[in-house]
Amino acid sequence: REQKFPDGQIVGQSVSLGHILRENRSFEVPADKWETRKVAIIGGGIAGLSAAWKLKKENFSDFVLLELEKEVGGTSASGHGDPVGYPWAAHYLPVPFQENTELVSLLEEMSLLEGRGPEGEILAKEQFLCREPEERVYYKGRWYEGLYLQVGASEDDKRQFAEFQKIIDDWVNWRDASGKRAFVVPLANCSTDAKVTSLDTISFGDWLRQKGFTSERLFWYCDYATRDDYGLNADQASAWVGLFYFCSRVRKSGVESQPFITCPEGNGQFVHHFLDKVKDNVRRSHIVVSVVPTEKGVDVICLDGGDIRGFHCEKTIYASPMFTAPYVIRGFRDETPFAAAEFQHNAWFV
């Protein structure tokens, strides 16, 4: 008997709050509504929460984190069900390479790691790893393991897939003159060699065509990858981010990509951990409407229900979506450090 899907719902940012930013209203803060903090963190997603966690680890507490929603988490938000929680969006974390020391430190703090392998590789505890098969594709009424559909593939499809995989292996092994990988997490450790950065000037689709790939199955596979991670198809995403998807999680050629750490609530487990450490510094339902650079630092103006509040700060960490920066940061449109106005935002449906 056909099973009826449960009714769904859309959760996330409040439209009415977003309209306040778009309308670019001016707000006057009453004199008795100003506070002073050395640092204000704007945004309570993983970026803002991890920044707050880092400050606390450095024994720095003179900061405030401002989140516009009633709950923190952003795109790592989760819900509470019976008997277990569930993710609304981001739901796994690839086990990091040993060089990613900050992230390894966090995972150790959360007791998610088992230890090290013979080559120093990070080993996560089995109970926190995604069960096999990690990935499946649904085709003509059946599930098949993996994301590339081997069933029904022609000899030419298989040949092109093998050629594509060889290119990926070559990039995984590639190092620049200083020993840096082309694609790795964190991004700060990626090579800036022109051979690598030039890949950001063409689309992934064009790169595939330039390499002579014509297999529809291979194009579907690559298109799925960019849609999955970036919300863009292969002709919208750059070749750099396309190759990053396939290379950054592979320790060395010939081995499988890193396993996934996951929990019932997805990446909500990290949200809960961070929040437990910094909850006294968090202000929920505070929508930041203006960030104004001053001679002494930065003034941050926000709405708290019907109240207008302000914070005199030395510095701010802007951990909100980048497309909002031109609407919030005073002068950002005039001296923008990057093309923030060109950012497009896609909703994340699960």
Predicted regions, residues:
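N-terminal Rossmann-like FAD-binding beta1-loop-alpha1 element of flavoenzymes
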Residues: 34-65
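Dinucleotide-binding Rossmann-like beta1-alpha1 core, especially the glycine-rich loop
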Residues: 84-173
